[in-house]
Amino acid sequence: MGSFMCRKTALVFFSPGPFAAASRRMLALMSAFMLAGCFFMLTGCGPAMTRPPRDRAGLEKLRATEDEQTGETNRKILGRLIECTKAEYDRRAAAGQPPIIDILIISGGGDWGAFGAGFLKGWKKVSSQDPLAMPEFDAVTGVSTGTLIAPFAFLGDQKSIDEMVNLYRNPGEDWVKERGFLYFLPNNISLAEVPGLEREIRNHINMDKLRQIAKAGADGRLLAVNTTNLDLGQSRVFDLVTEAQHAIDSGDVDRIHNIMLASAGIPGIFPFRIIDDQMYVDGAVTGNIIYGGRIAEEDSLPAQWQKAYPNLPIPKFRYWVIFNNQFRPVPEVVAPNWVAAIRRSLETSSRAATATAVRHLFAMAEISRLKRKADVEVRVVSIPSDWFPPVPGTFKKETMDNLVDLGEKMGADTSSWSNEPPSF
């Protein structure tokens, strides 16, 4: 399940944080991709895909247009969220309850996304009387494997949660397939094909599911995923509520499926996706969690609320981060060869980058508390550092079942949440 199932999480009004790359075992395949350079003389063995050329000036203009559109999208989403927040504020105030805005951020992590799926199932079991019970989220975002989880978490009903868990408990052998004996040839668009992943997205994110998503987001709630635009070298976050409505209106589900596949597409390993005539790959290249790292403080949700409603107190904001990985890799004696060195370096850097992003989110919350007198809470959960896969390999049922069980146990225990940033 590719980067989409890569060990790497989500919100559009938040710009992406640092990159957490592909899963530990899938990273080993990256070395095979590098070998392709050794076979450049074989490129004539098959036709290469071609794309219309663009000059530098055209690309710079395209980037400027994209930046403008992204800014406009962010403003619209912020506006929707503020309206949604005000409606929630009024409802809770009428009931004599303090208003709370809940934001779920789901990371990537490959097959280790089974942990997040299980965690949500366990969390769903927590009594509603518990102050840390699973809420209805005002915003849900995901990257890579988090992209698969996010729609189900957004809907939040038991049927959706069970459907998500069932998917992670039953990995298909065709989720990832090598292209054959000459899979490494540079003319191939990727080392592997993902027919199983494509099938799962078609089957689970069908028109009925899209109608549910559009209905759930009609009041301004947000569901968003991150992708990486390789042509422009930058992130692009897609609002899946808007995309779901577009699919319903047009009857065309291919676009939203391509967006999800792009968010899940490990560069070079899985096929890239062409969206709006541009090349897109794994969102984790530009942000394993999307949390607002590039947004100015005056554009943050607490600041926007103060501008819109200066005479009302800022509602409480709660950020819930599910990291489908361990913040620190398990210690090992690395083999003395370049393949092992590359694998271990990428693995270590991706986790360190995500830890830095989480620390940044905690720092941003502290700034809102100090500058805006806002009540902002951040909680994070991750796979325990002492956990180890029961069997080697990627997308193995025994490992994914183990992670679902672990996640479910931890999710049912609200003490699993940490309100402190990673300290190492």
Regions found by a protein language model. Give the residues of each.
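Bacterial N-terminal signal peptides
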Residues: 28-43
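N-terminal secretory signal peptides that target proteins for export/translocation
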Residues: 1-25
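Patatin-like phospholipase
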Residues: 45-138, 154-424
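Hydrolases whose catalytic domains are alpha/beta-hydrolase-1, hotdog thioesterase
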Residues: 149-152
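Extended hydrophobic/Leu-rich segments
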Residues: 19, 26-30, 59-62
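Gly/Ala-rich beta-loop-alpha elbow adjacent to hydrolase catalytic centers
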Residues: 141-142, 146
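Secreted/luminal cysteine- and crosslink-motif detector
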Residues: 5-7, 39, 46
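A periodicity- and composition-biased signal for non-globular, repetitive helical segments
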Residues: 13-14, 30-31, 398, 406
